[in-house]
């Protein structure tokens, strides 16, 4: 079973279904639920999901909690909570991209594909693909 790490924007497109990227995210998560992929995400990703839902989309806290709980119930999901902050700072120093993205990149286990639409991750030493590139 291939392994993937899902970034914030993949979960948001799946939850919100607000643009053309949502279809690919929905298809990918359907495949994850069916057992085709082993998936990882992190507490930092879920924190970003919560922030965007509350601050950008003005979704009620209770609804955001339900959405995050639904993510946590995803079949074949492992939540990564450990972070190598020194590694993230090194990435941040080298690239000047968002520190949260550097933290996420530092959490991606070796040989695992980071699934994201965020092009900044291509500046970091992680393998990055969009959902469409995996389907």
Please provide the spans of the model-predicted regions.
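Active-site neighborhoods of divalent-metal-dependent phosphate/nucleic-acid chemistry enzymes
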Residues: 76-113, 117
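Short amphipathic alpha-helical segments and helix-helix/interface helices
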Residues: 26-29, 68, 104-105, 118
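Acidic, PIN/NYN-like endoribonuclease modules and their adjacent C-terminal/linker elements
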Residues: 1-3, 74, 105-106, 110-135
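Alpha-helix capping/helix-boundary segments
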Residues: 10, 45, 84, 103-104, ...
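Active-site-proximal, substrate-binding regions of enzyme catalytic domains
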Residues: 26, 48-76
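Residues that scaffold the ATP/ADP-binding catalytic core of kinase and kinase-like folds
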Residues: 13-15, 52, 124
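Alpha-helix N-cap and coil->helix boundary residues
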Residues: 20-24, 40-44, 59, 63-66, ...
């Amino acid at each position: 079973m291939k392994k993937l790490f899902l970034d914030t924007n993949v979960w948001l497109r799946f939850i919100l279904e607000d643009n053309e990227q949502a279809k690919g995210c929905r298809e990918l998560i359907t495949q994850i639920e069916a057992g085709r992929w082993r998936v990882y995400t992190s507490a930092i990703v879920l924190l970003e999901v919560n922030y965007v839902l509350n601050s950008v989309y003005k979704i009620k806290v209770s609804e955001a909690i339900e959405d995050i709980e639904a993510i946590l119930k995803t079949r074949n999901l492992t939540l990564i909570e450990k972070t190598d902050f020194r590694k993230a700072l090194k990435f941040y120093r080298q690239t000047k991209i968002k520190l949260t993205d550097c933290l996420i990149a530092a959490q991606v286990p070796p040989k695992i594909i980071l699934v994201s639409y965020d092009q900044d991750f291509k500046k970091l030493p992680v393998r990055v693909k969009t959902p469409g590139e995996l389907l």
